[in-house]
Regions:
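A polyanion-binding, active-site-adjacent surface
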Residues: 1-217
């Protein structure tokens, strides 16, 4: 398959990826087409791009963040700013890169001034995220920060208490969910990186990935 054949799949493939198109990719493409002009909440009228998500649809794990920032909105890709660079280092520390995982957010359009998504915005995007999870059928969800964690679990405890513990994902209990800190939080609070490294080790152990202690996250 030629690279040109994959151009319409760019919203959910890693940048530069050349792979055979699977059934899951076809389903994700159809899902993207359903929502690409979504205006189910006010965020849809203000965005530059819908940040659908990207990565390996055959992945065992989905990393789920809060929502797009300025750079993500401009490029239409998740985690491409400073927090994204830190996420790349976090993945590398457990032997992964973006081609090994899938990355999504709880909301697909940028909230103004990068504020926390409002409940009605989370509710509007929830069906899309739920369908992404159902299509990919991961074994694990790694939630980054309180917004992603609280939106997927019927719990509202502080992320500092929830991180590092495994939970059943309520719609599909066979999928296990592990909360951790959002990379943007780690940039503001470097002292939390030790706890985040512990969380990554828990995930790596379940994935069977080699772990190497990073010189820094």
């Amino acid at each position: 398959m030629k690279i040109s054949d994959l151009e319409s799949f760019e919203p959910f493939l890693p940048q530069g990826a050349v792979v055979m198109i699977s059934s899951k990719q076809h389903q994700l493409k159809a899902l993207y087409r359903r929502f690409e002009h979504c205006q189910n909440c006010s965020l849809g009228t203000q965005r530059q791009n819908l940040v659908f998500g990207e990565g390996n649809p055959e992945s065992k794990v989905i990393f789920i963040g809060e929502g797009p920032g300025e750079e993500e909105d401009l490029q239409g890709r998740p985690f491409v700013g400073r927090a994204g660079k830190l996420l790349d280092r976090m993945l590398a520390a457990i032997g992964l890169d973006r081609s090994d995982i899938y990355i999504a957010n709880t909301v697909k359009c940028r909230p103004p001034n990068n504020r926390v998504p409002a409940p009605e915005e989370l509710n509007a995007c929830s069906p899309l995220l739920q369908e992404q999870i159902s299509i990919i059928e991961p074994k694990f969800l790694f939630t980054l920060g309180k917004t992603a964690t609280h939106s997927l679990l019927p719990l509202q405890d502080p992320i500092s208490q929830m991180r590092g513990n495994w939970y059943d994902y309520p719609p599909i209990p066979e999928i296990k969910l592990l909360p951790s800190f959002h990379p943007a939080y780690l940039l503001r609070n470097p002292s939390a990186k030790k706890a985040a490294w512990h969380d990554l080790q828990l995930l790596a152990a379940e994935l069977g990935n080699p772990q190497k202690k990073p010189s820094h996250l």
